[in-house]
Design a protein with these regions (language model features):
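Short hydrophobic/aromatic patch on the recognition helix
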Residues: 1-6
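Alpha-helical structural segments
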Residues: 11-37, 49, 53-57, 83, ...
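Solvent-exposed, amphipathic alpha-helical segments
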Residues: 23-34, 68, 124, 128-132
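Short helix-coil transition/hinge motifs at the ends and kinks of transmembrane helices
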Residues: 36-45, 104-109
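Amphipathic alpha-helical segments that line or abut small-molecule/effector binding pockets
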Residues: 41, 45-67, 123, 127, ...
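Amphipathic alpha-helical packing segments from all-alpha helical-bundle domains
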Residues: 57-64, 77-105, 116-123
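Short, hydrophobic secondary-structure boundary micro-motifs
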Residues: 70-72
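Hydrophobic/aromatic-rich alpha-helical bundle segments in the mid-to-C-terminal region
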Residues: 99-152, 161-162
Length: 163
């Protein structure tokens, strides 16, 4: 497939990365939905279970399609695919707000979280995740770093949420 067959970068990227992009976002959306389907009183006990499994699955999927994800992460500027992190941040923000509402209902309200700080922290979390892919380290090393990253962010969020 020659890049000269495409009138615009957007249509070239559409043919090269769309399927994997949509699947990747779908994995993340499914994890959010699966967590929200847990009975509310059980959600605090299972906070990391689904998200940990999802992050593992997303990392493995990205490594299975490494060239595609390198295109998305490093060369998609000017296409809709350049908004991967922003799209994931929006999904995570909604999930976080839904969970905060559950904590409130359970009588375990979190202190108010500044919306800008929340956005910065979530964006930082996804940037950290995607650095694992950008740097093309071994899968084993990336999986280890992901485990450490999750422990780091989970501890921080638990502190901020007063849990």
């Amino acid at each position: 497939m020659s890049p000269y067959n495409y009138a615009r970068k957007e249509s070239l990227f559409e043919s090269l990365v769309c399927e994997q992009y949509e699947h990747f976002i779908g994995l993340f959306q499914k994890a959010q939905q699966d967590f929200s389907n847990i009975p509310q009183e059980e959600q605090p006990k299972h906070l990391g279970d689904i998200s940990d499994a999802c992050m593992d699955e997303m990392l493995l999927y990205a490594y299975q399609h490494l060239n595609v994800f390198k295109l998305i992460l490093c060369h998609s500027e000017g296409t809709r695919f350049s908004h991967l992190i922003d799209e994931m941040v929006e999904i995570e923000l909604k999930g976080t707000h839904d969970y905060l509402a559950v904590l409130e209902k359970l009588g375990r309200p979190a202190p108010p979280i500044d919306e800008h700080l929340e956005h910065v922290l979530i964006t930082g979390m996804f940037n950290t995740f995607f650095e694992l892919i950008i740097h093309e380290m071994s899968l084993e090393k990336a999986q280890y770093y992901l485990k450490e990253m999750r422990a780091f962010y989970t501890a921080g969020w638990m502190k901020i949420m007063g849990q």
